[in-house]
Amino acid sequence: MKIRPASSSDMERIMKIEENAFIPNIQETYQTFSCRMAAFPHGFLVLEDDRGAVQGYFSSELWEKLPDNNKVFILDHDPLKVHKADGKLLYVSSFALMGSLRGRGLGKLFFRECLKEVQKSATQIDQVILIVSQEWGSARHIYEGLDFKAIRQIPGFFPSDIIPGGADGIVMIKTLEENV
């Protein structure tokens, strides 16, 4: 397995991973992923298996500061409106692995290594923020295992097939040390 920057030729596979990982009402669009890649190429990484097939992706943006409102977290938002090349806050906008790779510890390893890679090209980053659904216990386990702390809850943020009115979004943050 190797981590490398995503390219436009990966988009079809990234969309397959998106469809595999999320229910339809949460899946983000091809256009959104293309904009993320254009806004911050060093912050959009893929996990490639030994055959060269993309099996996971990690997309992120640099923000100036922690937002004081919840609107900036909206799904399918335009990263070009919020990304700041000199931002110190890394927002992980999306992260997913193909289902066949889940449950083996690869998610945590991939996520941690992506943070390290992004930090190499954006050395000013001092905090990482993300939003996760209350329904995604495995994802929360990864983030908590990497010392992310919940700082805010957004009621009904994520569409849900299980929870009427939607699942709460949990905003989590981690302050970075020299070594992630």
Language-model features: locations:
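Conserved acyl-donor/pantetheine-binding loop and adjacent beta-alpha core of acyl/acetyltransferases
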Residues: 59-94, 156-166
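Conserved GNAT acetyl-CoA-binding A-motif
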Residues: 90, 111, 118-134
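Conserved beta-strand-loop-alpha-helix junction that forms the acyl-donor binding cleft
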Residues: 99-102, 128-140, 156-167
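Conserved acetyl-CoA-binding loop of GNAT-fold acetyltransferases
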Residues: 143-153
